[in-house]
Swiss-Prot record:
It is an enzyme of class 7 (translocase). Belongs to the ATPase alpha/beta chains family. Produces ATP from ADP in the presence of a proton gradient across the membrane. The catalytic sites are hosted primarily by the beta subunits. GO terms for molecular function: ATP binding; ATP hydrolysis activity; proton-transporting ATP synthase activity, rotational mechanism. HAMAP family: ATP_synth_beta_bact. PANTHER family: ATP SYNTHASE, ATP SYNTHASE SUBUNIT BETA, MITOCHONDRIAL. The lineage of its organism: Bacteria, Pseudomonadati, Pseudomonadota, Gammaproteobacteria, Alteromonadales. ATP binds at residues 151-158. It comes from Pseudoalteromonas atlantica (strain T6c / ATCC BAA-1087). This is ATP synthase subunit beta 2. GO terms for cellular component: plasma membrane; proton-transporting ATP synthase complex. Pfam families: ATP-synt_ab, ATP-synt_ab_N, ATP-synt_VA_C. It comes from the Bacteria.
Amino acid sequence: MSQGKVVQIIGAVVDIEFPQDSVPKIYDALRITEGDLQGLTLEVQQQLGGGVVRTIALGTTDGLRRGLTVDNTGEAIQVPVGKATLGRIMDVLGNPIDEAGPIGEEERMSIHREAPTYEDQSSSIELLETGIKVIDLVCPFAKGGKVGLFGGAGVGKTVNMMELIRNIAIEHSGYSVFAGVGERTREGNDFYHEMNESNVLDKVSLVYGQMNEPPGNRLRVALTGLTMAEKFRDEGRDVLFFVDNIYRYTLAGTEVSALLGRMPSAVGYQPTLAEEMGVLQERIASTKTGSITSIQAVYVPADDLTDPSPATTFAHLDATVVLSRDIASLGIYPAVDPLDSTSRQLDPLVIGQEHYDTARGVQSVLQRYKELKDIIAILGMDELSEEDKLSVSRARKIQRFLSQPFFVAEVFTGSPGKYVSLKDTISGFKGILEGEFDDLPEQAFYMVGSIEEASEKAKKM
């Protein structure tokens, strides 16, 4: 094991000089062996020549000084994997941070791995029911697929994510891995207690690298979580992998890239944006042995979907759930935009003709309503034809019926959460489209589960 000395420190970036004949490889983990920060891990990012390597620190560099001895471990960062990680909260290095003692003697794996080869990969078209009406209807998820939840600040990405985890973990009863990448510590804490109260904590591994962590931690924590998910997949399981938030992964890459002295590209992002995203996303794949279904929250800066970060993420996904500020401002939650959200599964050969026709019918009615909004604003409803009046009335009912009370929001709303099966979702929307509920007031459709509840609610109004 070779030893080197710290020669330069620039924020989270540390340069270390090794003997010329034993320079560490790219991605090798190095460890500080003396001083206040003994045990601090550094990851090699560049070889500068002359025996000097440039590393990124996975922890604070406050108190680091030149001349300290550094050991080369000779391998990439190794994190614990397997059943010992379930029910535990870990940091980027796999160390427990939940004060529940050490993680049992388990297998360790490198966080840097190759993506599965073409021969090993498998594609499935089996649907994953989420119990959330708008998602199951308009942008259905595939088992083993990749889903992105896109939204600006405060439109409900994390709440939607928590509801999906709760519904799928309880109904699907598989293992899940949750990677908290650069999000609020409070949300991580809420999430832990939510899982504990729902009695699904023993099926979830939690890996956190929160907002206050150095950029190295936030950049690598997604890979740590992914490695744990890959292990479950390779054991032949169907595993769920949740990332909140993919944008912070990109942002950490931007910070690291600037510190490493690379020229920034568009909007100040790193020049390697597409490649860094690809390295992560290509590993999130299903193989012939098991599947990884991944659900990722994607922050959209300034609500601009054409920003390079969300735009790069779009290319990798099978389904996109777009959360809209306009819909949230109407008080309709989940604030999913049914006209902007897409899914590759929305195909009659996959979901069946009835589901497809209902989804497209809902979209066309909502699209017509959107087109008529200007006319209504200027001339009022009375100027519309009878047909258009009916369309608008149905569209407003559909819009309200797309809302749904969440289990994870019970404490705030006071109304119990609802899980709606796909069959009930389709029959409800089909009924509205066919005019079976034209006589009910539109308020009856707001924040209910199935269509029967809307009919019950109408009787009390």
